[in-house]
């Protein structure tokens, strides 16, 4: 069950995506987004950027990963670099490539890079997705890793600038699946989730990331159009129906580090980073 290292660096064919206001509004509603422009479908939320990259990113993972390991896949990290906001009417094109495979003591990490452009070729955003294959062993590491975004201990030792408490609804995963296009049964089928070693269905990691983005934008009192980077590491799953709490530190000019914990105080998002135009 070796990973296909020959696929590293090979781009997928571009995938087209039309940005519709209804899809923006549906995504905002599915993530309990409090920002009015998002709810009205006038401006895409930050994590909405993953939707145009969903198909090409999955294709890039499948190019390197053995099919028999796919049910052991979990989302490890996500990192967005924003060059311009996504708004209704945009015709977008996204391509993705697997760029690295890394063996760890607990499994194998596959790093995928995606880039989304307008119909005219202008760069809209770049993304790095790290997927983790639990329990996979015996793989040679190759290629590159995604950019780092770890929270420095010196930053963690400072006072927080704020903390936001939010609630993940009992039906959150069902509501998120349709507008996101992510129907992975670990988020929808209790029996299936348990069969692959999870405690039950879990919230989509990107949905939890969207919650954290609302928290950071609100506490920073920032215009979401000025967001330049948003990154997290998915540390632990969040069951639906739980409260979560996001603590935020200032880490530089326009930059904030953040960490999200569940109601059991387990850290679910770590090494969070949000960078706004100063």
Regions found by a protein language model. Give the residues of each.
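Catalytic-pocket segment enriched in acidic/His residues
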Residues: 187, 191-253, 258-266
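Hot-dog-fold acyl-thioester-processing enzymes
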Residues: 1-77, 138, 142, 146, ...
């Amino acid at each position: 069950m070796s990973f296909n290292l020959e696929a590293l660096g090979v781009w997928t064919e571009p995938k087209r995506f039309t940005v519709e206001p209804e899809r923006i509004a549906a995504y905002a509603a599915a993530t309990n987004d409090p920002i009015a422009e998002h709810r009205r479908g006038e401006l895409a939320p930050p994590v909405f950027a993953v939707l145009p990259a969903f198909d090409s990113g999955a294709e890039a993972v499948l190019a390197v990963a053995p099919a028999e390991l796919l049910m052991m896949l979990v989302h490890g990290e996500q990192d967005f670099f924003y060059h311009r906001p996504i708004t209704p009417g945009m015709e977008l094109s996204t391509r993705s490539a697997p760029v690295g495979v890394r063996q760890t003591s607990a499994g194998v990490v596959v790093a995928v890079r995606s880039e989304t452009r307008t119909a005219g070729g202008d760069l809209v955003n770049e993304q790095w997705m790290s997927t983790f294959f639990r329990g996979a062993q015996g793989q040679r590491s190759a290629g590159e890793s995604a950019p780092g975004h770890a929270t420095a201990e010196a930053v963690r030792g400072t006072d927080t600038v704020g903390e936001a408490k939010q609630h993940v609804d009992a039906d959150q995963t069902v509501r998120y699946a349709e507008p996101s296009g992510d129907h992975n049964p670990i988020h929808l089928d209790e029996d299936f989730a348990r069969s692959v070693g999870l405690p039950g269905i879990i919230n989509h990691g990107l949905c939890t990331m969207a919650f954290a983005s609302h928290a950071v934008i609100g506490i920073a009192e920032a215009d979401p159009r000025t967001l330049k980077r948003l990154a997290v590491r998915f540390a632990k799953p969040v069951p639906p129906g739980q409260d979560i709490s996001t603590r935020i530190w200032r880490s530089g000019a326009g930059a904030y580090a953040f960490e999200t914990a569940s109601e059991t105080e387990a850290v679910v998002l770590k090494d969070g980073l949000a960078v706004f135009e100063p």
